Regions:
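Short hydrophobic beta-strand element within catalytic cores of glycosyltransferases
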Residues: 69, 74, 78-81
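Short alpha-helical donor nucleotide-sugar binding micro-motif in glycosyltransferases
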Residues: 48-53
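A charged, aromatic-enriched C-terminal amphipathic alpha-helix characteristic of glycosyltransferases
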Residues: 122-152
Length: 155
């Protein structure tokens, strides 16, 4: 991405469960000024990063639900995720997808990053973000749970 003219820095966050990968990230940080490994972020810092970022990338190979995607959309950020069924289910057309199981996954990811940079924040209609985020608001989920429990209690 940066070799092809991309100007944004890549901030990596989260707990790495592999010493080898963590070592590799440390080496990568030393060799390029464009990669910054943040490690695990506390909630306040995580939300500050969402607010400050120009886009959110989530190239996960396996994902249970994908709450970080919903959180990034809450901040109306362009989101790029791996092409997994769970992301289609929760985010639909509000995010961009990238296949990670191909030989050219890295160039595809870099091209998608460049496209997001070119398009800017306008790359995703606000109405799509609002629709996705609205489905997962605490109030709505709590109401659905209450209704479910009341239905079970009547039987």
């Amino acid at each position: 991405y940066r070799k092809d003219g991309g100007t944004k820095k890549l901030y990596l966050a989260g707990k790495i469960r592999s010493d080898a990968i963590e070592t590799l990230l440390g080496e990568c940080q030393k060799e390029t000024d464009g990669v910054c490994y943040q490690g695990y972020l506390e909630t306040e810092e995580k939300y500050r990063m969402y607010a400050a970022c120009s886009a959110f990338l989530f190239p996960s190979r396996a994902e249970g639900f994908g709450m970080p995607v919903i959180e990034a959309l809450t901040y109306r950020k362009p989101v790029l995720v791996s092409d997994l069924p769970i992301f289609h289910e929760i985010a639909g057309d509000a995010v961009r997808y990238c296949k990670l199981d191909t030989e050219d996954a890295v160039p595809q990811l870099a091209a998608a990053m460049r496209q997001i940079e070119e398009d800017g924040k306008e790359s995703i209609p606000e109405s799509l973000c609002e629709a996705v985020v609205g489905r997962y608001k605490k109030e709505r989920l709590a109401g659905g749970l209450k209704e479910f429990l009341e239905t079970i209690g009547k039987k």
